[in-house]
Every structure is written in structure tokens, then in C-alpha cells.
């Protein structure tokens, strides 16, 4: 099991190899949970657009979580929050969501969660 050290949550390009690998892991996880018609997975190129803020949580050089907001006119929609099983139970998802909330407030928007 992975153990938490200093966690950094930073704005990143989701196409970088370790982050893209985590997004692919999330895709596999979501595909196993929901039927194709219910899965509205946002691809890496979309996540890299200027209207998306994508964050990765890292510790000791390892990517241990991610999350994004997609900017709309008056709100930001939460996308792609994920913490892999090896890093769960340490509160990382809360930290990632708090960072997304902070970014949303900085932009003067409201936060909305999509499914």
C-alpha cells in the first residue's frame, strides 16, 4: 500500500505520460462500472483544452490522483476525479476537490458536478 507523504496538487497537461496513464486507468474503471451509453468519458485532448483546468496530485514523484473542472459560462463542472486503489483511504479525493473548488472561486464561477 502507498503511504501519504507531502502531497502537491498542481495544474498539469493531462497528456503527460504518468497522468495519461492514470486517466486510462480511470477509463477502465468507469467502463467496468457503467454501460457504454451512460459513460460520458472526456478524452485527453478535450481535457487539455484551454477551457479545462486539469490537476494532478503527486507525492514523491508518483501521480496519485487527478481531477478537473470544465469551464462553462457561469459555472465550472467537475470532471475526472480519481484516486487509484493503491492511494485510497488517505483523503486525497477531498484534497483534489478542495483544489478544484479553490480554482472555481478564483475564476468567479459556481461549481457543478456532472455524472
Where do the protein language model's features map onto the residues?
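A short helix-loop-beta-strand connector motif used in the catalytic cores of GNAT acetyltransferases and
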Residues: 45-56
Amino acid at each position: 500500500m502507498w503511504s501519504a507523504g507531502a502531497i502537491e496538487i498542481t495544474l498539469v497537461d493531462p497528456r503527460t505520460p504518468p497522468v495519461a496513464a492514470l486517466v486510462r486507468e480511470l477509463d477502465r474503471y468507469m467502463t467496468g462500472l457503467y454501460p457504454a451509453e451512460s459513460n460520458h468519458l472526456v478524452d485527453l485532448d478535450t481535457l487539455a483544452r484551454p477551457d479545462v483546468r486539469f490537476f494532478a496530485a503527486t507525492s514523491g514523484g508518483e501521480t496519485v490522483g487527478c481531477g478537473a473542472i470544465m469551464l462553462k459560462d457561469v459555472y465550472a463542472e467537475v470532471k475526472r476525479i480519481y484516486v487509484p486503489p493503491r492511494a485510497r483511504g488517505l483523503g486525497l479525493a477531498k484534497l483534489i476537490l478542495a483544489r478544484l473548488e479553490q480554482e472555481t472561486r478564483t475564476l468567479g464561477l459556481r461549481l457543478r458536478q456532472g455524472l
